[in-house]
Regions:
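Short runs of predominantly hydrophobic/aromatic residues within well-ordered alpha helices
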Residues: 13, 29-32, 37, 69-74, ...
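Short, surface-exposed loop and linker segments with low hydrophobicity and enrichment for Pro/Ser/Thr
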Residues: 26-28, 64-66, 89-91
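Surface-exposed, Lys/Arg-rich phosphate-binding patches that contact polyanionic backbones
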Residues: 3, 10-31, 35, 60-62, ...
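Low-complexity intrinsically disordered segments
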Residues: 80-123
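N-proximal short alpha-helices
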Residues: 2-6, 71
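Membrane-topology and secretion signals of cell-surface/extracellular proteins
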Residues: 15-20, 31, 40, 46-47, ...
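Short, basic amphipathic alpha-helical segments that act as recognition/interaction helices
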Residues: 27-51, 106
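Short, positively charged interaction helices/loops
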Residues: 42-85
């Protein structure tokens, strides 16, 4: 398995993490990050490893970000890209989906300010 110890958002998305967490009253900032990754994957976009943005933003330790759910998120990324859990680009895919999901949620909120965090948990 590829070693993943931390994931950072882009510098631009550092503030989004705080804003969205506050707007949705989610408690800790890792909750919006988990939702963002899943939301990005749900939208079906497939990134190239070279699409990665800067990493000057919010830093998450793997255990803080995923808790005991890391195997689930790892499986979702691997299935989405049809790759093994030894793929060297896994950290990039996690980061890109984190950034993409945050940006998508932010656009959604701008289009519909009445959204709740639970809107992203149910389809």
């Amino acid at each position: 398995m590829t070693q993943i110890t931390q994931i950072k958002t882009s510098a631009k998305n550092k503030e989004l993490v705080t804003q969205l967490t506050r707007k949705f009253a989610l408690g800790t900032e890792n909750v919006i990050a988990r939702i963002a990754i899943a939301y990005s994957l749900r939208n079906g976009i497939r990134f190239k490893p070279t699409d990665v943005k800067d990493a000057g933003g919010k830093e998450y330790n793997k255990n803080v970000l995923f808790g005991n759910l890391f195997p689930l998120y790892l499986s979702m990324i691997c299935a989405h890209y049809n790759i093994k859990d030894t793929n060297k680009d896994l950290p990039r895919y996690f980061k890109m989906h984190l950034d993409d999901g945050l940006e998508r949620i932010d656009r959604d909120v701008k289009d519909n300010p009445n959204l709740f965090g639970f809107d992203y948990l149910f389809d």
